[in-house]
């Protein structure tokens, strides 16, 4: 559903299940994250997503649409099995334990585009690179013509429980490194700040599958 005041979209049916994964109410978490998503949206004008996982499924908790005339328009496309093909999914996968990764990736890796990494060995190299760099990208791996940047949100045990990603038409960033850097810096800042809030309000950090 859409909150008409904030213009954000939410998956209402997912909130209860997300609350069972973390140690405080999902509404509280999403409400706190909202202004940070809005800030990214204001700075970049691009679509912004707050994501997490439900078992082995990737779920979108909140989304802000792009404000640009030419924009990414994918709404709530089904990303349940797209952990390996999205910046939001890979940003979490790269920092999970090996056991959690294997559980999520045990099935067939669906190929969404010609750029989707659906080979486990190649994906492993990609996740190692993400772990080293601290962020993930999706270069037309989920949707043709779309480039995304995603950062993990960590709990007080440095385990990823959510992620923020920003999506842009690829042509806008191909020859504009400054624009890409602006996207990365705004998403990184928000992911860190939201993580700080989680660490202050949650001292258990052991209920999720990271």
Which residue ranges define each predicted feature?
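Amphipathic alpha-helical effector-binding/dimerization core
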Residues: 10-105
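Juxtadomain coupling helices with adjacent low-complexity linkers
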Residues: 161-210
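Short clusters of small/polar residues that mark proteolytic maturation junctions
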Residues: 63-65, 141, 165
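Short, basic/aromatic recognition patches
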Residues: 32-41, 105-150, 189, 197
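Beta-hairpin "wing" of winged helix-turn-helix
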Residues: 1-5, 10
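Sensor-regulatory modules in signal-transduction proteins
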Residues: 153-156
């Amino acid at each position: 559903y859409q909150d008409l005041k904030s213009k954000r979209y939410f998956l209402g049916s997912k909130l209860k299940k997300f609350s069972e994964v973390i140690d405080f109410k999902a509404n509280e978490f999403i409400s706190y994250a909202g202004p940070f998503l809005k800030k990214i949206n204001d700075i970049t004008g691009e679509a912004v997503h707050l994501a997490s996982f439900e078992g082995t499924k990737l779920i979108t908790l909140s989304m802000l649409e792009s404000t640009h005339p030419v924009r990414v328009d994918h709404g709530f496309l089904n990303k349940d099995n797209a952990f390996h093909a999205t910046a939001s999914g890979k940003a979490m996968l790269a920092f999970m334990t090996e056991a959690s990764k294997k559980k999520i990736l045990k099935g067939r890796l669906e190929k969404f585009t010609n750029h989707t990494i659906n080979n486990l060995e190649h994906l492993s190299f990609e996740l190692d690179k993400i772990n080293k760099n601290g962020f993930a990208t999706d270069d037309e791996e989920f949707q043709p013509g779309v480039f995304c940047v995603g950062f993990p949100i960590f709990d007080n045990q440095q385990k990823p429980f959510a992620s923020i990603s920003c999506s842009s038409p690829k042509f806008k960033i191909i020859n504009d490194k400054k624009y890409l850097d602006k996207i990365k810096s705004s998403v990184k800042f928000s992911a860190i700040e939201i993580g700080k809030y989680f660490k202050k309000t949650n001292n258990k950090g052991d209920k999720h599958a990271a």
